[in-house]
Every structure is written in C-alpha cells, then in structure tokens.
C-alpha cells in the first residue's frame, strides 16, 4: 500500500520560453499532514499547486495522488475530490453563500436535503451562523467572513485533500490570527491532508506539521519547524531563519 497521500516524482516544469518554474522536484507527504509551502514570488509555489490539481501538466516526471498517477485520473473528477481555497476566496459574487458552498455537492448529484445539511454543518464549523449567512452574497460579508466561507466550500464534498493558496494573506493581522486559530482547530478535528502556500515564515511554522521551502523552482529544505530552525540546510534557509528570529525579536 502506498504510504503517501501526495507525491511528486522527479518533476520539472518548463515553459515555452525555456525557463523552468520547477526543477527536479522529489517530494511527498502523508495522509492527515499539513505541509506549508513557502517561498518568494517566482519561487514556484503556484506552479506546485497547479500541478497537484492538474491545472497544468509536468514537462517531465509524475504527480501521484493517493497512490495513482494524476495523469491517469480524469482532471474534472480529480478537482472535485480536492478542496481548493484561492488567495481571494474565489467566491462567485452573484451567487448566495448557500449556492457557493453547495456547488461541488450539487455537481456530484447530492440530494438537496443532504446539501443543506452539509451547508449548515460547515458554516457552523467555521463559526458562521447559517441562518444569518446562507442567503447573503459575498459582497455583504467582511473579508474574514468570505475566507471562512471559502474554507467551508473547499470542505463541502468532504475531500481527503485540501489545497490553500495564501488563504489569509489579504487579511488584517487580527483577522489573520483568528483564522489561523480556526484553521488549527479544524485540522485537529478533521485530519485532512493540507497543502498551505504562504510567504509568511511565522505562519508556516505555526500551521505546518512540516515545511517545504522553495527558491527559484528548487526545493531548499523539507522538515518540521524545529528541524528547519535547528539545522537550516542551505544558506537561503539560514537567511530565512535569521529573518524569522529578527522579526520575532
């Protein structure tokens, strides 16, 4: 039995102009783990996520999801099994919160009663009142509320894997900290396999069981927060750790 929930096997992604977004990536994570993916703009973080949900294909190598090569899985069906939270929440502005959250269950053919039960449960799970929120539109909510709805939508069909692309990056510090607390509470309860992209080292250390550090399309280090703080593997990681300590101090 394959022990990995997600694997990237010797993957490179080259664009038509010859530049590489990712080079020789060998990476894996186990079921129920939260992996924080950190790097500067242009480091390959977004390409990494897009490979996982088959929005793009690798130039070489293979992406393996739950033991099966992604290239052998129908991309539409695959994405419906992967929860996804984009940076801006990605809610449809002219749909109600109910319509947004119930989208994937509806596409999967769930009975309406089951969809509504799931809606109530998930909104409550992310600390929103279903009776007050369900019929409202995204523009009527605060930024923090919209991100909570985006998380609820990503979990709607109970996917085993959830991808989060800078989910808290556009929020004020107080709301960001509150949603980080909510994320930790949800993960302790649900034990999903989570890939969280961030540019914030403190957020990566707080939310990730392990951390993958990218620079210019190459993995610099993968390890627990303690492993990275205690033994930076490259000069770049050492610099990040120095900045982290300076910011905290």
Language model feature labels by segment:
Residues 38-40:
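The feature captures the beta-strand-to-loop junction immediately N-terminal to the Walker
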Residues 113-132, 185:
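Conserved ABC ATPase "signature" region
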Residues 156-160:
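A short, proline-enriched helix->beta-strand linker immediately N-terminal to the Walker B motif
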């Amino acid at each position: 039995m394959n022990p990995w929930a997600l694997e990237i096997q010797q993957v490179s992604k080259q664009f038509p102009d010859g530049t590489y977004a990712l080079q020789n990536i060998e990476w894996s994570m186990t079921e129920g783990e939260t992996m924080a993916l950190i790097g500067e703009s242009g480091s390959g973080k977004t390409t990494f996520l897009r490979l996982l949900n088959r929005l793009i294909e690798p130039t070489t190598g293979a992406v393996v999801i739950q033991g099966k090569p992604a290239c052998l899985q129908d991309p539409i069906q695959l994405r419906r099994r992967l929860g996804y939270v984009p940076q801006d929440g990605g809610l449809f502005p002219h749909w109600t919160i109910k319509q947004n959250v119930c989208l994937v269950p509806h596409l999967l053919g769930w009975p309406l009663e089951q969809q509504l039960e799931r809606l109530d449960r998930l909104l409550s799970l992310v600390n929103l009142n279903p009776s007050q929120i369900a019929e409202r539109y995204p523009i009527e909510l605060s930024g923090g509320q919209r991100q909570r709805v985006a998380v609820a939508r990503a979990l709607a069909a109970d996917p085993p894997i959830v991808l989060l692309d800078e989910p808290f990056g556009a929020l004020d510090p107080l709301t960001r900290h509150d949603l980080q607390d909510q994320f930790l509470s949800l993960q302790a309860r649900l034990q999903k396999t989570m890939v969280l992209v961030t540019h914030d080292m403190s957020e990566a250390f707080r939310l990730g069981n392990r951390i993958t550090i990218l620079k210019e399309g190459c993995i610099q280090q993968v390890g627990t927060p303690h492993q990275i703080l205690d033994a930076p593997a490259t000069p770049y990681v050492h610099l990040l750790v120095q900045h982290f300590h300076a910011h905290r101090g």
